[in-house]
Protein backbone atom coordinates (compact mmCIF):
# COMPACT_ATOMS: atom_id res chain seq x y z
CA UNK A 1 0.00 0.00 0.00
CA UNK A 2 1.31 3.43 -0.94
CA UNK A 3 0.32 6.99 -0.14
CA UNK A 4 -1.74 7.20 -3.35
CA UNK A 5 -3.93 4.26 -2.29
CA UNK A 6 -4.38 5.74 1.18
CA UNK A 7 -5.38 9.14 -0.21
CA UNK A 8 -7.86 7.48 -2.59
CA UNK A 9 -9.63 5.59 0.21
CA UNK A 10 -13.20 6.41 1.15
CA UNK A 11 -12.15 7.16 4.73
CA UNK A 12 -10.09 10.13 3.53
CA UNK A 13 -13.16 11.57 1.80
CA UNK A 14 -15.21 11.35 5.00
CA UNK A 15 -12.66 12.46 7.61
CA UNK A 16 -12.35 15.98 9.00
CA UNK A 17 -8.98 15.18 10.55
CA UNK A 18 -6.61 12.84 8.73
CA UNK A 19 -3.68 11.33 10.63
CA UNK A 20 -1.27 9.09 8.74
CA UNK A 21 1.36 7.57 11.01
CA UNK A 22 4.66 6.46 9.43
CA UNK A 23 3.71 8.24 6.19
CA UNK A 24 7.36 8.13 5.09
CA UNK A 25 7.08 4.36 4.69
CA UNK A 26 4.16 4.88 2.27
CA UNK A 27 6.00 7.29 -0.01
CA UNK A 28 7.12 5.89 -3.36
CA UNK A 29 10.81 5.62 -4.18
CA UNK A 30 12.37 7.48 -7.08
CA UNK A 31 9.96 10.39 -7.28
CA UNK A 32 10.80 13.07 -9.82
CA UNK A 33 10.03 16.78 -9.38
CA UNK A 34 6.64 16.45 -11.09
CA UNK A 35 5.64 13.51 -8.84
CA UNK A 36 6.61 15.51 -5.76
CA UNK A 37 4.65 18.53 -6.98
CA UNK A 38 1.58 16.38 -7.71
CA UNK A 39 1.63 14.82 -4.23
CA UNK A 40 1.95 18.21 -2.52
CA UNK A 41 -0.89 19.58 -4.66
CA UNK A 42 -3.06 16.60 -3.78
CA UNK A 43 -2.49 17.17 -0.07
CA UNK A 44 -3.21 20.89 -0.51
CA UNK A 45 -6.49 20.11 -2.30
CA UNK A 46 -7.59 17.97 0.64
CA UNK A 47 -6.59 20.67 3.14
CA UNK A 48 -8.34 23.38 1.09
CA UNK A 49 -11.69 21.72 1.86
CA UNK A 50 -11.27 22.65 5.52
CA UNK A 51 -9.81 19.34 6.66
CA UNK A 52 -6.62 18.91 8.66
CA UNK A 53 -3.85 16.50 7.68
CA UNK A 54 -1.18 15.25 10.07
CA UNK A 55 1.65 13.13 8.72
CA UNK A 56 4.36 11.57 10.85
CA UNK A 57 7.55 10.89 8.94
CA UNK A 58 11.05 9.59 9.55
CA UNK A 59 13.45 11.86 7.69
CA UNK A 60 15.85 8.93 7.14
CA UNK A 61 13.18 6.91 5.29
CA UNK A 62 12.07 9.64 2.95
CA UNK A 63 13.16 11.44 -0.19
CA UNK A 64 14.85 14.61 1.09
CA UNK A 65 13.46 16.84 -1.66
CA UNK A 66 9.93 15.68 -0.89
CA UNK A 67 10.48 16.20 2.83
CA UNK A 68 11.74 19.74 2.15
CA UNK A 69 8.69 20.49 -0.02
CA UNK A 70 6.31 19.12 2.59
CA UNK A 71 7.92 21.10 5.40
CA UNK A 72 7.85 24.28 3.28
CA UNK A 73 4.14 23.96 2.54
CA UNK A 74 2.97 22.84 6.00
CA UNK A 75 1.32 25.22 8.46
CA UNK A 76 2.82 23.43 11.45
CA UNK A 77 6.09 21.48 11.57
CA UNK A 78 7.08 19.71 14.78
CA UNK A 79 10.35 17.82 15.23
CA UNK A 80 10.76 15.21 17.96
CA UNK A 81 14.23 14.71 19.39
CA UNK A 82 15.72 12.52 22.10
CA UNK A 83 18.92 13.18 24.04
CA UNK A 84 20.67 11.23 26.77
CA UNK A 85 21.47 13.70 29.58
CA UNK A 86 22.97 12.41 32.81
CA UNK A 87 21.66 8.91 32.20
CA UNK A 88 18.11 10.17 31.59
CA UNK A 89 16.44 10.10 28.21
CA UNK A 90 15.09 13.60 27.49
CA UNK A 91 12.44 13.93 24.81
CA UNK A 92 11.83 17.30 23.23
CA UNK A 93 9.24 18.57 20.79
CA UNK A 94 10.65 21.43 18.73
CA UNK A 95 8.20 23.81 17.06
CA UNK A 96 10.00 24.42 13.78
CA UNK A 97 7.15 26.19 12.01
CA UNK A 98 3.75 27.44 13.18
CA UNK A 99 1.96 29.75 10.76
CA UNK A 100 -0.95 31.89 11.90
CA UNK A 101 -0.32 31.28 15.59
CA UNK A 102 -2.69 33.29 17.79
CA UNK A 103 0.15 34.36 20.06
CA UNK A 104 3.72 33.58 21.06
CA UNK A 105 4.72 29.94 20.64
CA UNK A 106 7.11 28.07 22.93
CA UNK A 107 9.86 26.77 20.62
CA UNK A 108 10.80 23.68 22.66
CA UNK A 109 8.57 21.51 24.82
CA UNK A 110 9.70 18.62 27.00
CA UNK A 111 7.51 15.53 27.13
CA UNK A 112 7.43 11.95 28.31
CA UNK A 113 5.20 8.89 28.25
CA UNK A 114 4.17 7.32 31.55
CA UNK A 115 2.61 3.84 31.80
CA UNK A 116 -1.06 4.12 32.68
CA UNK A 117 -1.06 7.88 32.07
CA UNK A 118 0.09 8.34 28.49
CA UNK A 119 1.58 11.48 26.95
CA UNK A 120 2.69 14.06 29.53
CA UNK A 121 3.95 17.56 28.76
CA UNK A 122 6.60 18.73 31.21
CA UNK A 123 4.92 21.92 32.42
CA UNK A 124 8.14 23.16 33.98
CA UNK A 125 9.48 23.45 30.44
CA UNK A 126 6.49 25.40 29.09
CA UNK A 127 6.16 29.11 29.76
Locate predicted features:
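Phosphate-binding/switch region of NTP-binding enzymes
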Residues: 57-118
Amino acid sequence: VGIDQVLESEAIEQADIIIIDAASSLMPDGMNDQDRFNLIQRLRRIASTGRSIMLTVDRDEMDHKLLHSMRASAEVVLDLTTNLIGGDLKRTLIVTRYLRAAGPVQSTIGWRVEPGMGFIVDITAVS
